[in-house]
Amino acid sequence: TKKKALMQQQLGGFFRTELTKAFGPEPEPATLPIDRAYLKTANLSAVAFTECTVTDFHEGEHKGRRFSAANVELRRTVEEKSGPDNDNWMTRTETLFRGIVVRCKDICDPALDIALNDMFQERKKDDITDPAAFRKYFAAHTADGREVNDLVTPQLRDLVQKLEASSGSAKLCGLILRDGDLTLALNTRYVFAGIPEELDLRDIDGIRKWFTASLTGMGNLLDLITESPALTGAAE
């Protein structure tokens, strides 16, 4: 957007400095890309997407652990019959996911192989403590597609709840623990390394504060993930 270009022009230097201060220099090329090709193979959404937008991708280190993150939107086009006699086809675009995708390297037990996907059921935040309820809202699979609901430990359920409690608008879309790495797709209004649309461009101080806070927010999220006992693979 024009607004974004203008902001980059004015504050690009500040943004880069803050990012490097928070997460170190950006590797070239990226070792943990978040792009269309990766999102297609990762299957973070239970419903396949046809279009995606990735913005503010950054890779770096937090407390010695390599990670990458980006703001992502996944959409699909749906064809529906419409008109008085249902004889017209109408195409509409549906947003499947809007939030952040985070990849963490060498963060969990390499023996773990589990992918959790939100099943797109309506639910309230507090519905997922109970194993039976959790099963209704999330499907668990291995890399080769086997269903592994029994491998969902209390620790893993607890991690999902903590992720959803991390911000008022957070809702898990997908979480993958595989080959020692973790990938997270979290629906949220939180914007990583960026600022929300509605911020006034003339408020330079406000933009700076917001940007820095978004980096701190990512650090907190990474701490929450790293500290989870779910990553060691040991059930109680």
Where are these regions (language model features)?
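Alpha-helical transmembrane spans
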Residues: 1-5
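GGW-centered surface loops in extracellular recognition modules
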Residues: 9
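Nuclease catalytic cores
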Residues: 12
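Charged, low-complexity intrinsically disordered regions
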Residues: 17, 21-23, 29-75, 80-84, ...
